[in-house]
């Protein structure tokens, strides 16, 4: 089965996680998408976030090892990676924790129905898929640990 490499970012602001309501999939999900040719996962994530919701973020969990010698750049470490089915093919998804820089400028594009900032307790709503809930809780915990 064909497997695409994709990224997703759990964007945190004021101890809430942003989820988008995807129009085509009719699911509440983190912002994300495919990694294009000649693009790093970090570049893909920043691009997808800008295209889908129009804001800037800081990707957290970056390496503190100096980028010296033959190293072009350090990439953030995903907090979770999985392979899941999307019908006729699979996605290998790298999940990241992000800090919203300008959340007041958030505006969804036409791929999305809606967005919502979810507090920890709000993630128990029926419309939040179990995997997204679990990943959101892990992202919130990691975010708070990284900023302590």
Enumerate the language-model features and the residues they cover.
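Short secondary-structure boundary/capping segments
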Residues: 1, 9, 84-88, 106-108
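Active-site-adjacent beta-strand/loop module that shapes the phosphate/pyrophosphate-binding cleft
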Residues: 69-104
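Conserved Nudix-box catalytic region and its N-terminal flanking loop in Nudix hydrolases
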Residues: 16-58, 64-65
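Short connector loops at helix/strand junctions that flank enzyme active sites
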Residues: 4, 30, 52, 87-93
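Active-site beta-strand termini and strand-to-loop segments that position acidic
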Residues: 11-14, 22, 98-100
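Conserved N-terminal beta-strand and adjoining loop/helix that marks the start
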Residues: 1-17, 37
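NUDIX/MutT-family hydrolases
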Residues: 94-99, 104-139
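Compositionally biased, intrinsically disordered linkers/stalks adjacent to structured regions
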Residues: 137-148
């Amino acid at each position: 089965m064909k497997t695409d490499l994709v990224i997703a970012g759990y964007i945190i602001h004021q101890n809430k996680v942003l989820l988008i309501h995807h129009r085509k999939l009719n699911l509440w999900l983190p912002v994300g998408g495919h990694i294009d040719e000649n693009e790093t996962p970090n570049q893909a994530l920043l691009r997808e976030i800008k295209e889908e919701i129009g804001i800037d973020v800081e990707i957290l969990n970056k390496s503190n090892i100096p980028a010296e010698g033959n190293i072009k750049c350090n990439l953030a470490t995903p907090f979770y990676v999985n392979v899941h089915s999307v019908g006729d093919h699979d996605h290998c998804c790298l999940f990241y924790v992000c800090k919203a820089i300008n959340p007041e400028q958030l505006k969804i594009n036409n791929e999305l129905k809606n967005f919502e900032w979810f507090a920890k307790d709000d993630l128990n709503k029926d419309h939040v898929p179990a995997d997204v809930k679990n990943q959101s809780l892990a992202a919130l915990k990691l975010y708070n640990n990284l900023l302590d």
